[in-house]
Design a protein with these regions (language model features):
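N-terminal beta1-alpha1-beta2 module of alpha/beta enzyme domains
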Residues: 1-68
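Acidic (Asp/Glu)-rich catalytic clusters
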Residues: 2, 34-35, 61-70, 96-103, ...
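Flexible, glycine-rich active-site loops centered on histidine and acidic residues
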Residues: 2-19, 81-147
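Hydrophobic faces of well-ordered beta-strands that scaffold small-molecule active sites
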Residues: 5-9, 41-43, 73-76, 103-107, ...
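Active-site mouth loops of central-metabolism enzymes
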Residues: 9-24, 78-86, 161-171, 224
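Active-site-adjacent beta->alpha loops and helix N-cap segments on the catalytic face
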Residues: 53-60, 194-207
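An alpha-helical appendage that flanks or caps ligand/catalytic pockets
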Residues: 119, 125-156, 198-243
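A conserved active-site cap/scaffold subdomain adjacent to cofactor or substrate pockets
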Residues: 177-193
Length: 243
């Protein structure tokens, strides 16, 4: 069995660094990943978080695409609950038109921040009109697939790229896996957020019963020059859960 390795970068701002330093390091990391043969380079979305420098993965994706030539670049992911599916489709259709065959649209269900930023992002949105997450994702799927848009439609998510962005649903439940399978999207199990091995096996089993696509697993990894350095870095890692 062969494996393809990719990177999900959150653009962390280290102590005594600026956001500009963190973003410059993200660009360098993407270029190094391409040189080393990594398959994908994804950018996360976090709001009102001074330690993380990327609230808008779409903007970073455009910049990274212009600084690389081969590696696939995408979001890991767009927090769809905050946005119009139509506008997300426009953004990623534009990115896909700029770099055909290199753009991934990863979508998440989480807020990507705490309630204060969620309220600010969703100011003026009506929950009844927005619909459920599944309804939003279905709308988005319709906007990014040219075959779903007939010539007679009054509204299209232009430009219509020659190679659409690939759709990925990020999640850690059988419900998310089933939703991705129903839309023929790819699925990413967020083991970096929920590493329960039993849940992973259950979700992967459900996925394989409902989709012929491979499953992607996101994990936390620490890389260093030596095992001792890696162990020292691991001791500094703190994992927080917010309910």
């Amino acid at each position: 069995m062969s494996w393809r390795i990719s990177i999900l970068d959150k653009s962390p701002v280290a102590e005594h660094e600026t956001a500009a330093d963190a973003l410059a390091r993200t660009i360098t990391l993407a270029q190094q990943a391409e040189t080393l043969g990594y398959h994908r380079f994804w950018i996360a979305e976090h709001h009102n978080t001074p330690q993380l420098a990327s609230p808008s993965p779409e903007l970073l994706i455009a910049w990274i695409l212009g600084q690389t030539t081969r590696i696939r670049v995408g979001s890991g992911g767009v927090m769809l609950q905050h946005y119009s599916p139509y506008k997300v489709a426009e953004n990623f259709n534009l990115l896909a038109a700029l770099a055909p065959g290199r753009v991934d649209l990863g979508v998440g269900k989480a807020p990507g921040g705490l309630p204060l930023s969620t309220r600010a992002l969703q100011l003026g949105l009506h929950p009844q009109e927005k619909g459920s997450f599944a309804e939003q994702l279905t709308q988005l799927d319709g906007w990014i697939r040219p075959e779903n848009q007939s010539a007679e439609e009054a509204v299209r998510a232009t430009p219509l790229p020659s190679v659409p962005a690939q759709g990925f649903l990020l999640g850690a439940s059988t419900e998310s896996a089933l939703l991705a399978a129903s839309l023929d999207w790819h699925f990413v199990f967020a083991a970096h957020l929920n590493g329960d091995p039993a849940l992973l096996r259950e979700v992967v089993s459900t996925w394989r019963q409902n989709s012929t696509r491979d499953v992607i697993v996101a994990v936390q990894a620490i890389v260093a020059e030596s095992q001792e350095q890696a162990d020292a870095l691991a001791q500094k890692v703190e994992v927080w859960g917010v309910e």
